[in-house]
């Protein structure tokens, strides 16, 4: 019997090991297939003007005449001061900034920068969709360093004289100030991006870039959207999926980021496995790598210490570090809430959560949506209202990835508290919305006015109706003004409402 048991266990273990190996091989095959597809798309792009950037470190910035320094960080360029605009809302955020780690060095011609389309001097006063595709290779370079590579590549724009950069990935938005336009060329921008990364990160051995300025004769926004769908999204989803294998319970350290304090002086972003940062640039894995590489930089460790509230995600260590790094402005952060002590808001968020008092529910809105919300304001107006480093109870910036989290606004009732969102955003997140509430969340196609939203929620029997008096009249929370504390009794009411939806 013992011999049979041992043989059975050995067979089961071998079978499991075989399954793991098969899964790994299938994942590797899929990754290689995607890499080949990306190379084919790279090669299929129209020919452009080729510039060979210096590859000798002594000459990395030869020819570049614009300043690159921290004092340039956080510039905002108003419409009247704009020389040109790339991406952004005029093109429904159909532009991209794509960073790729290439495994085969022979695919890259080091220092090659190809500008497909017009140069900067040819597009004064214009607004065009665009795509920056940057590739890096190094023997020790893996996708674990992707967030680090992305951040350092962005510095050519974020710290580049005259540039305004907002958002990331496929929602990127650039403007160039007319005062500094004479200093700039796209070829030198590509040179700055790849060589800044080489200086900061010696593992990078080779790099090249393609800059697509998508005029109509080059396919316009349709061309950049095709590249987003075929290149950016599959690559980023695979990387994000790996990041989601961790949960907050798996780690004893979160990470903080203060890079946005150049324009939001009291803002502190807390990066956790289940709570990606608003900007969408980094993950918990990326923050860990960046902190290990530069322990004295703007990314820092946050030891969790005692868990004050497991359901809401409040930790003594997070509160202490946020208080210290926010110039002692804020004392509490509840990680899984947008209503009670949410994280502060900078201005880089890809989407936002907002409280709708007329129905005692939450709404979502993303940058791509240009219409009004039930608050009777657009995303841009809402963003202007809640940004700047304030703690706005009931209003919180998020990244596109945040609603995919298992702990998305869990303390507020999770998805069962969400009552409205744009149709396109809802479709994007469909697989992450619980089936019992999906059809009960209104979009602009159903209603926008708060009174009409109230009737819609009653008609579909949305879970939030359980919070209303007799299921008929909402009892809105008395939310405190920004940067102030909750009344202790009202905070209890807010927390109990979240728990009630949890039990439901």
Q: Would you name each region that the model predicts?
A:
Residues 25-26:
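PRPP-associated nucleotide enzymes
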Residues 2-5:
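Low-complexity, intrinsically disordered or signal/transmembrane-proximal segments
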Residues 31-503:
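Cysteine-centered metal-binding/redox modules
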Residues 12:
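Extended, histidine- and acidic-residue-enriched regions that form the cofactor-binding/catalytic faces
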């Amino acid at each position: 019997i013992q011999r049979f048991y041992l043989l059975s266990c050995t067979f089961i273990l071998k079978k499991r090991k075989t399954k793991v190996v098969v899964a790994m091989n299938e994942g590797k095959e899929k990754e290689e297939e995607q890499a080949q597809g990306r190379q084919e798309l790279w090669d299929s792009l129209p020919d452009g003007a080729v510039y060979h950037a210096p590859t000798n470190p002594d000459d990395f910035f030869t020819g570049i005449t614009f300043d690159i320094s921290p004092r340039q960080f956080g510039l905002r360029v108003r419409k009247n001061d704009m020389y040109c605009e790339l991406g952004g809302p005029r093109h429904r955020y159909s532009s991209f900034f794509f960073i790729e780690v290439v495994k085969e060095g022979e695919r890259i011609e080091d220092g090659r920068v190809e500008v497909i389309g017009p140069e900067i001097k040819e597009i004064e006063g214009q607004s065009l969709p665009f795509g920056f595709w940057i590739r890096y290779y190094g023997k020790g370079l893996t996708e674990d360093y992707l967030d680090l590579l992305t951040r350092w590549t962005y510095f050519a724009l974020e710290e580049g004289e005259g540039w305004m950069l907002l958002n990331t990935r496929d929602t990127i938005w650039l403007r160039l100030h007319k005062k500094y336009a004479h200093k700039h060329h796209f070829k030198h921008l590509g040179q700055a991006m790849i060589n800044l990364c080489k200086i900061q990160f010696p593992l990078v051995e080779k790099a090249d870039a393609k800059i697509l300025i998508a005029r109509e004769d080059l396919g316009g926004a349709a061309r950049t959207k095709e590249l987003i769908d075929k290149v950016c999204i599959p690559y980023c989803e695979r990387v994000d999926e790996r990041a989601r294998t961790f949960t907050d319970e798996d780690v004893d350290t979160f990470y903080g980021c203060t890079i946005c304090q150049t324009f939001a002086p009291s803002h502190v972003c807390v990066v956790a496995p289940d709570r990606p940062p608003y900007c969408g640039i980094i993950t918990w894995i990326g923050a860990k790598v960046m902190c290990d590489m530069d322990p004295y930089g703007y990314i820092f460790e946050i030891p969790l210490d005692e868990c004050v509230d497991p359901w809401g995600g409040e930790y003594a260590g997070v509160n202490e570090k946020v208080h210290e790094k926010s110039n002692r402005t804020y004392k509490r952060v509840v990680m899984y809430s947008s209503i009670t002590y949410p994280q502060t808001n900078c201005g880089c968020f890809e989407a936002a959560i907002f409280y709708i008092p007329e129905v005692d529910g939450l709404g979502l809105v993303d940058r791509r949506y240009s219409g009004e919300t039930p608050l009777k304001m657009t995303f841009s107006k809402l963003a202007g209202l809640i940004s700047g480093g304030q703690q706005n109870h009931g209003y919180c910036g998020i990244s596109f990835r945040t609603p995919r989290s298992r702990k998305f606004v869990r303390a507020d009732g999770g998805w069962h508290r969400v009552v409205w969102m744009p149709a396109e955003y809802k479709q994007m997140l469909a697989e992450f919305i619980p089936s019992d509430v999906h059809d009960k969340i209104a979009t602009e196609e159903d209603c926008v006015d708060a009174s009409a939203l109230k009737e819609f929620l009653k008609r579909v029997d949305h879970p939030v109706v359980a919070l209303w008096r007799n299921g008929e009249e909402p009892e809105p929370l008395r939310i405190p003004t920004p940067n102030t504390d909750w009344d202790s009794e009202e905070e209890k009411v807010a927390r109990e409402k979240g728990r009630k939806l949890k039990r439901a």
